Amino acid sequence: MDPLIPIRKTVLDNGLTVLLREMHHAPIASFWMWYRVGSRNERAGITGISHWVEHMLFKGTPSFPQGEFDKAIAREGGMFNGMTWIDFTTYFETLPADRIDLALRVE
């Protein structure tokens, strides 16, 4: 990452922190949503629950039944994924910049 490209930080009224880093060398946008929950938050008897919850997004939502979000992203030439670690769970979508609204609708 180029350290000369600034990162703008905004905290919304609901407490959500938004970080924005604009790079204009390609017509794409990548949207990441980070949650401060991971395996360190689990207790005996529910280990793996953070990763399980991560995978539930891929099972569908009220707006995107199972399989529809992946099809919509693929139609636009994008990709998405998620990951769980010790202290975070994150989801991301990378799409043509003019279609970033699709990523915002699922999150």
Predicted regions mapped to residue ranges:
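His/Glu-rich zincin catalytic helix
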Residues: 1-70, 92-97, 105-107
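Catalytic zinc-binding patch centered on the HExxH motif and its immediate surroundings
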Residues: 22, 81-84
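Short, solvent-exposed loop/turn segments at the edges of secondary structure
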Residues: 26-28, 75, 86-88
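N-terminal Rossmann-like or analogous alpha/beta NTP/dinucleotide-binding catalytic cores
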Residues: 75-80, 102
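Conserved catalytic neighborhood of penicillin-recognizing serine enzymes
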Residues: 84-85, 96
